[in-house]
Amino acid sequence: LGGIHFFPTFIVFFCCMPMAQNFSQSYNWTIFLGFGLCIIGILLEIISDKQLHAFRKIHPSGTGIIETGLWNYSRHPNYYGEIMFWWGIFVFGFSFSGLNYLLLAPIAMTAMFWYASIPWIEIKILRTRPQYKDYQKRVHILFPEITILKRLFKG
């Protein structure tokens, strides 16, 4: 379990090192883009976690499926927010350093969610809630933009 928590911490440290060296650099649009992505990502995480917490209070048995709020557009909006945060950190850090290797950090975090966390939770939910299959057909696994586009062009 410690390794799971160490990996994201290592990536943060790795990604932020160049910023510490070059913080006196003048501002440009990528700094603001990175900062904006971080803020939006954090807000998505906070809002989706609050929505999930409220849903679990109403449905303590763990058998229901949340399909309201942000969860109406993404099956994992909290993870989407987390991934957006990491890409924001990359854009912010890249604007200070210009180091292409920093791209490894958000790619690693995205891969960790896409190939480990999300599949694990999807399998776990399907075991206890077979009706989740219908939700999977309607709502994209991660990207709310895809759900929105599908709905716009479907009807």
Q: Language-model segments: which ranges?
A:
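Alpha-helical membrane-spanning segments of integral membrane proteins, especially the hydrophobic core
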Residues: 1-5
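Hydrophobic transmembrane alpha-helices
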Residues: 9-51, 56-155
